[in-house]
């Protein structure tokens, strides 16, 4: 009996030892798996930052700096992979899903910064269709990059499929207990992290993790926080909170300038506004000489400059300011009002002129869905939008409709209209990139010490400027023969994407403009020509440099109209400020105020400006009756 008890006891000790050994093995295996997942997370975050920053030292500095959240980002990726592995039921399978979701946007962001100044924002995916439409142009400009991208995508798909098959067959399975433990560990931490990422709310924990939302400077936001966290911070940018102090009483306290008694107009002049794509004065470039002058007409008539809030693209944001008299400075950085915010009727020059009995028409020789223009122009009150879909076929210069053919179409439509009209036209010929063989013959000679590729780009661009200038002269010659007063306004939407032409000539340090800098630098990188001309009174001079938001003030003043908002309120702001940019104010006297939005107190006129804009775009529209009565009457009548 004693021998039996001894045998049972020995067997129990052996079983306990075997169980302990198995637990140790499982624990060691789990630790190895977690460590490997952590290494994948580190490698993935490092790869993403190298791609976006395009700098090995800068990426190393990002990881080495204890004041930046590189390791917080690694922790988030680590937790995400643990959670996804638990869902799939196999170790490390999450890496095959998360890696491309992280690396592909990083590559897109790096490529975006080749053409524009900004990194990739979540809102950029709202206009993916626009990018695909322009893809042939981009491919033509950078064919080897396109070949590399396509080859890389094919290789990535093939490798991904092979890895997925290998993972499904060979990656270790997770037990039910292991899956539950991973979910229980990762999910609460990920949810907690997500809840502290609202940049509108201060978070002590987020601050300790070194995640600092820098919404007023997105370049610094991405540099400090890294691509993944900065991108995540920007996810709620479509939500616009009311500015502090916004309420009905605040709107009621904004004074309305009384309209002059018995205001008369000079026979209701016709108004044509031309926003010329990428139009700029290339003779500003140092170290080069262009002969003959590509823009003699505009140079003679130019009365000032528009300070564009954009560079090399994002035309719709400039257009938004020009038509509404509102400012991008009061909207989240990186937002695109045409894509995100214009969902309901908004006051604009179109509604003003329609209220005065005008035909109000938008004209653009491209597809109406681009930049959501069909819906936006309807919300702005245009009674017609003539686009590529419903206009006669346009003659092309390169792959875009020519300025000459668009001008002829404007003249044709104007001649058919008996009532006074307001036409807003957006040209297309000047759109970049500027491939060497766009035109069969360039008539502008480029002299100077430039690489041949840059010389060809500049010659192509200068030829487009010349043809835009010729088209304006054609329109003016037609207007001079008209009895009714005709006002023509032309301005460029932004500087062209000339890429290395800027750095080769020394005009800019890089190939894209800076978002912040001294006043002279900002003006050099954001000023485009402005012409305000009447067939009865000639050109308006000494306008200076103004934001697009003040164009409505200039147009109505030139036409002899008064309005509570466009000439009254904006006129009051214009009396003090000429440029209203997110990072800089330029006063009437030419003095600049940097980072004005970060000051403890914003000037009262700009505070009220923000209140009125928010009220009409996002708020309760308390200001409608006092500032935009004609807009309200137009829409109440169902027009």
UniProtKB/Swiss-Prot annotation:
It is a multi-pass membrane protein. GO terms for cellular component: plasma membrane. InterPro entries: Alkaline_phosphatase_core_sf, OpgB/LTA_synthase_biosynth, Sulfatase_N. The chain crosses the membrane at residues 34-54, 69-89, 96-116, 144-164, 185-205, 227-247. Keywords: Cell membrane, Membrane, Transmembrane, Transmembrane helix. Pfam families: Sulfatase. Gene3D superfamilies: Alkaline Phosphatase, subunit A. It is found in: Cell membrane. It comes from the Bacteria. This is Putative cyclic beta-1,2-glucan modification protein. The lineage of its organism: Bacteria, Pseudomonadati, Pseudomonadota, Alphaproteobacteria, Hyphomicrobiales.
